[in-house]
């Protein structure tokens, strides 16, 4: 018999009754029923109930065990009585009557309980992550992540992609976030950067003649934490393809993503591919976001003209100043009590808005603060434009075009959630396309890249030379699921002349471009294929599949929201001798003044 186990703790069934088995695992729960002591023994695979009869040689040893001690139990498998069968466990028809028990490792008093559903502060969970990972839900999430990654590897390989690894120590690049820098000991005063993405390397692989690349790529960005963004590092399904159009990229990855969510989505509905394509401008207009949640049926309507020169002075003034007014319908809320509308007004103020105006379409006409000062014909035009019916209400967002669009999107999400309109049993995918190539920096007034600087502009060099930069669209796209951006991607700018001109418009001289991107730019001078790709976030996909509120619930050892590893104690000071070896000196910011 094996020293530690003949079976795992999830393997034994009624058909095994009568055999002698040996199990090893952790003491999950211990229950004393007078003449019998029960221990639920847990390992990676499941739980088996072990029975220790009073008076037996093993009873005293079992009685002294603390939860989470590691033991090996040898005994006879017996069927449970019908009234003691546990249908919640795959092993629930049997139990192991212990004959010997060996303690492999004892556990101290636990700082957090592993068994049960008790909640603990996240700081405590992260400090004792090795215990937290034993808990059923988190353990299941991490296994889901592992299975998702294995599935993605198989799918990409089956579709002709080759897995490559790209450098972790590389040069800094403007990916939109701060780099993590690594000082060079051999080259004092110079630094490597951890890659924000394998962007340049995967493009260089296409230039090198490899047709289809992928990897489960680690990416490093020194940016603040959000529910859907982990500080420090994250992983993405990074892929690139040669000789492809935008539609080729979509057609290749849609069945991978759709198939993944069908495989691991627990029976929830998944958008049938091809996924909808929504232009960026249309997304901002209809959904108030470039990552719309299509499970929400509410659509935003532009009603600017209904308020131009109208009797409602506040909105008329905004429109006269170049602003816009967007309307968000709220079906069936016209009869709601005043408190419903007051609470939404309070919420809007908490979001930084002045309030949330509305019109109620009652059987005897339009009602509410706005309707009192708005001509009836204009109110009726709003009702028709929004598709509202009698008994509905319509809410409004007004201001500068982008501000009004985004706040209308926030209102749409709030109403969809509060009114129970969002179907939690679906995964709704879409592509956002036709992103602007450039935007104006509000602080400096300069033209800057709006997203990825390596995207091919629609219209190529002719567009760069002949169009207002703010009107140029890029062959750039995002894949969105349930309001979560899974990835950005693009057809790449593979021509040096187009790239240099694109960077020139954004304020980069040729010398600076050569200095920062000379490796890739030089490679393009020796024959580069048209190519494109994307990089769906693994962490975000698993978060959606596991129905978790934040990424830390699907990462084995995440940093906390302040970018700290509480378990390993990172970041941490380093000895002065090490700093000297690296030719570094620390200049700390001044301590904040007290009082």
UniProtKB/Swiss-Prot annotation:
MF terms (GO), sorted A to Z: aspartate-tRNA ligase activity; aspartate-tRNA(Asn) ligase activity; ATP binding; nucleic acid binding
Gene Ontology cellular component terms for the protein in this record: cytoplasm
Presence of keyword Ligase: yes
PROSITE patterns referenced in this protein's UniProt entry, alphabetically: AA_TRNA_LIGASE_II
Subunit: Homodimer.
Enzyme Commission number, as recorded: 6.1.1.23
Keyword Ligase annotated: yes
Binding, ATP: 221-223, 485, 537-540
Reactions listed under catalytic activity: tRNA(Asx) + L-aspartate + ATP = L-aspartyl-tRNA(Asx) + AMP + diphosphate
Stated family: Belongs to the class-II aminoacyl-tRNA synthetase family. Type 1 subfamily.
UniProt-annotated location(s): Cytoplasm
UniProt-annotated site: Important for tRNA non-discrimination, residues: 33
Entry binding sites for L-aspartate: 175, 221, 451, 492
Pfam families: GAD, tRNA-synt_2, tRNA_anti-codon
Protein name, UniProt field: Aspartate--tRNA(Asp/Asn) ligase
Alphabetical list of CDD domains matching this protein: AspRS_core, EcAspRS_like_N
A GO biological-process term: aspartyl-tRNA aminoacylation
Keywords: Aminoacyl-tRNA synthetase, ATP-binding, Cytoplasm, Ligase, Nucleotide-binding, Protein biosynthesis
Residue numbers spanned by region Aspartate: 199-202
Function statement: Aspartyl-tRNA synthetase with relaxed tRNA specificity since it is able to aspartylate not only its cognate tRNA(Asp) but also tRNA(Asn). Reaction proceeds in two steps: L-aspartate is first activated by ATP to form Asp-AMP and then transferred to the acceptor end of tRNA(Asp/Asn).
Enzyme class: ligase
PANTHER family: ASPARTATE--TRNA LIGASE, MITOCHONDRIAL, ASPARTYL/LYSYL-TRNA SYNTHETASE
């Amino acid at each position: 018999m094996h020293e530690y186990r003949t079976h795992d703790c999830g393997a034994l069934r009624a058909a095994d009754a009568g055999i002698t088995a040996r199990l090893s695992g952790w003491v999950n729960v211990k229950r004393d029923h007078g003449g019998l002591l029960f221990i639920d023994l847990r390992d990676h695979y499941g739980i088996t109930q072990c029975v220790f009869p009073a008076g037996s040689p093993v009873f005293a040893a079992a009685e002294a065990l603390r939860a989470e001690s590691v033991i090996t139990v040898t005994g006879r498998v017996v069927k449970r009585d019908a009234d003691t069968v546990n249908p919640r466990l795959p092993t629930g028809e049997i139990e192991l009557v212990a004959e010997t028990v060996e303690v492999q490792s004892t556990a101290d008093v636990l700082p957090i309980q592993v068994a049960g559903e008790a909640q603990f502060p996240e700081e405590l969970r992260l400090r004792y992550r090795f215990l937290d990972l034993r808990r059923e839900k988190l353990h299941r999430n991490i296994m889901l992540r592992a299975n998702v990654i294995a599935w993605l590897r198989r799918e990409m390989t089956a579709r002709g992609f080759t897995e490559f690894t790209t450098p972790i120590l590389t040069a800094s690049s403007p990916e939109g976030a701060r780099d993590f820098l690594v000082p060079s000991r051999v080259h004092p005063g110079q630094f490597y950067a951890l890659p924000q993405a394998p962007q340049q390397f995967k493009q260089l692989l296409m230039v090198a003649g490899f047709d289809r690349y992928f990897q489960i790529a680690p990416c490093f960005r020194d940016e603040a934490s959000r529910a859907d963004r982990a500080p420090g590092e994250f992983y993405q399904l990074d892929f690139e393809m040669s000789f492809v159009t935008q539609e080729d990229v979509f057609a290749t990855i849609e069945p991978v993503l759709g198939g993944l969510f069908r495989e691991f989505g627990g029976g929830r509905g998944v958008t049938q591919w091809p996924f909808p394509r929504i232009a960026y401008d249309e997304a901002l207009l209809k959904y108030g976001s470039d990552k719309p949640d299509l499970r929400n049926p509410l659509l935003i309507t532009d009603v600017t003209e209904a308020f131009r020169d109208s009797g409602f002075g506040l909105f008329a003034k905004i429109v006269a100043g170049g602003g816009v007014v967007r309307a968000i319908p709220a079906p069936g809320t016209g009869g709601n009590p005043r408190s419903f509308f007051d609470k939404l007004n309070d919420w809007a103020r908490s979001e930084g808005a002045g309030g949330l105006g509305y019109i109620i379409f009652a059987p005897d006409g339009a009602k509410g603060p706005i309707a009192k000062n708005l001509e009836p014909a204009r109110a009726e035009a709003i009702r028709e434009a929004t598709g509202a019916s009698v008994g509905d209400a319509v809410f409004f967002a007004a201001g500068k075009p982008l501000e009004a669009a985004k706040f209308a999107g926030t209102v749409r999400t709030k109403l969809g959630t509060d009114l129970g309109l969002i179907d939690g049993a679906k995964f709704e995918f879409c592509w956002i396309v036709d992103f602007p190539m450039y935007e104006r920096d509000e602080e400096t007034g300069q033209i800057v890249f709006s997203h990825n600087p390596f995207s091919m502009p629609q219209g190529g060099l002719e567009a760069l030379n002949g169009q207002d930069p703010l009107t140029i669209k890029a062959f750039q796209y995002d894949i969105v699921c349930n309001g979560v951006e899974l990835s950005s991607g693009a057809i790449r700018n593979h021509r040096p002349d187009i790239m240099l001109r694109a960077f020139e418009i954004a304020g980069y001289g040729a010398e600076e471009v050569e200095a920062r991107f000379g490796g890739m730019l030089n490679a393009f001078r020796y024959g580069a294929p048209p190519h494109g790709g994307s990089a769906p976030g693994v962490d975000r996909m698993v978060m959606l599949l596991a129905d978790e509120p934040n990424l830390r619930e699907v990462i084995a050892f995440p940093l906390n929201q302040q970018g700290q590893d509480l378990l390993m104690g990172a970041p941490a000071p380093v000895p002065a001798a090490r700093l000297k070896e690296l030719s570094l000196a620390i200049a700390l910011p001044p301590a904040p003044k007290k009082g």
